[in-house]
């Protein structure tokens, strides 16, 4: 079944409050001579100029780095595009769902199985980290200007930042790694599973040092009797019977609300987390 996500409904523009509050703005018609004149006067005394327009539009509006840096050689020119400054797609417009999410492979990676329909992303999920990447580039260029007296050009793209977020799997592809078919099933081991609680929430385990943390987990969750079961009495046996163990853990977690599980595990020394909903975070 395919579903469509509906964004949160509010009388207040929450996206604007997150990204644009306290900003000051000035509208210029860069197709007019007066607008171009005002822009160039502003550039003379500016530290940073940022654009997200594709190359052809910049050329038309005369806002390329080659247009503005001669006016002020201390200017740091920052560019954020969909697909980069060069290449056959450099002229294309994009949003984060297209370039950061879909084109980078992230959209495919998070699918539960190869037959699952791709999912979408929250508003700005790719824009925010890409903006931080551009900010870091600009700050580095400003530091360089402190040392050299000269500005320059820095740039990044939505696709580049998406590729970095998916870097481990892209690197695997570069190594010609085998990408097995994905199936919706229990995890490969119970130490890294996602478990549903009585109140419909999800708890995640990330027990890497099993020799140290597994006994603590069993004690915290009142499962020490499993040590007496031959199927789980050693890590070798446990791994051989992990599907049976996974079912036992599913049943155990299903007896408790998430808050109860957190109380049991929070001081146990076990590495775990839980899935929040967005409106949960306003209380924390």
Q: Where are the regions that the model predicts?
A:
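N-terminal helix-loop segment corresponding to the beta1-alpha1 unit
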Residues: 1-150
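A short catalytic or substrate-binding loop motif that flags glycine-/basic-rich loops and adjacent residues
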Residues: 10, 185-188, 197-198
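Conserved hydrophobic ligand-interaction patch in extracellular adhesion modules
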Residues: 47-49, 272-275
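Conserved beta-strand edge residues that scaffold enzyme active sites
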Residues: 57, 279-280
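A short glycine-threonine-serine/GTX helix/turn-capping micro-motif
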Residues: 118-129, 153, 182-192, 203-204, ...
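Mid-domain beta-loop-alpha active-site segment that forms a flexible
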Residues: 124-139, 158-166, 209, 213
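Substrate-binding/catalytic subdomain of NAD(P)-dependent oxidoreductase enzymes
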Residues: 142-182
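Aromatic-enriched alpha-helical interface/lid elements that frame and gate functional surfaces
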Residues: 191-272, 280-283
């Amino acid at each position: 079944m395919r579903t469509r996500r509906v964004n949160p409904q509010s009388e207040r523009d929450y996206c604007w409050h997150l990204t644009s509050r306290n900003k000051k703005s000035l509208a210029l018609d860069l197709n007019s001579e007066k607008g171009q004149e005002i822009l160039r006067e502003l550039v003379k005394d500016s530290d940073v100029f940022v654009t997200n327009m594709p190359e052809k539009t910049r050329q038309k509006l005369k806002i390329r780095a080659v247009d503005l840096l001669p006016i002020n050689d201390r200017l740091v020119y920052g560019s954020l595009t969909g697909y980069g400054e060069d290449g056959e797609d450099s002229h294309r417009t994009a949003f984060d769902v297209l370039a950061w999410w879909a084109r980078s492979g992230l959209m495919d990676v998070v699918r539960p199985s190869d037959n699952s329909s791709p999912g979408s992303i929250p508003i700005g999920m790719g824009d925010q980290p890409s903006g931080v990447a551009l900010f870091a580039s600009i700050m580095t260029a400003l530091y360089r200007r402190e040392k050299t007296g000269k500005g320059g050009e820095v740039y990044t793209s939505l696709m580049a930042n998406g590729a970095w977020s998916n870097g481990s799997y892209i690197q695997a592809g570069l190594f010609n790694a085998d990408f097995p078919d994905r199936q919706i099933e229990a995890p490969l081991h119970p130490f890294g599973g996602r478990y549903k609680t009585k109140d419909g929430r999800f708890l995640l385990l990330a027990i890497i040092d099993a020799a140290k943390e597994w006994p603590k987990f069993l004690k915290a969750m009142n499962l020490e009797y499993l040590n007496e079961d031959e199927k789980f009495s050693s890590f070798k046996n446990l791994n051989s019977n992990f599907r049976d163990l996974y079912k036992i853990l599913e049943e155990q977690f299903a007896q408790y609300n998430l808050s109860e599980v957190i109380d049991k595990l929070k001081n146990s020394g076990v590495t775990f987390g839980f899935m929040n909903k967005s409106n949960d975070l306003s209380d924390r």
